[in-house]
Amino acid sequence: RECQSQSHRYKGACVHDTNCASVCQTEGFSGGKCVGFRGRCFCTKHC
């Protein structure tokens, strides 16, 4: 199962999944992706 949590460090609108994933990795997650109309960065990890 994969868990999601909104990034605390990502600033601004999320446009590129790779940028989001890089920030998420610094937060201890395995990756991340942009979600929603406003472009929020959500981090993902196996749980």
From Swiss-Prot:
For this protein, the record's SMART domains field holds: Knot1
* Origin species: Echinochloa crus-galli
Name the PROSITE patterns on file: GAMMA_THIONIN
Q: Which domain of life is it from?
A: Eukaryota
GO BP = defense response to fungus; killing of cells of another organism
Lineage of the species this protein comes from: Eukaryota, Viridiplantae, Streptophyta, Embryophyta, Tracheophyta
Please give the Gene3D superfamilies that the UniProt record associates with this protein: Knottin, scorpion toxin-like
Q: Identify the InterPro entries for this entry.
A: Defensin_plant, Scorpion_toxin-like, Scorpion_toxin-like_sf
Which segments does the entry list as coiled coil? none
S-adenosyl-L-methionine found in the keyword field:
no
Known function: Has antifungal activity. Inhibits spore germination in F.oxysporum (IC(50)=102 ug/ml). Inhibits hyphal development in P.infestans (IC(50)=50 ug/ml). Does not induce morphological changes such as lysis of hyphae and sporangia in P.infestans.
Q: Which family does it belong to?
A: Belongs to the DEFL family.
UniProt name for this protein: Defensin Ec-AMP-D2
Keywords associated with the record: Antimicrobial, Defensin, Disulfide bond, Fungicide, Plant defense
Q: List the disulfide bonds.
A: C3-C47, C14-C34, C20-C41, C24-C43
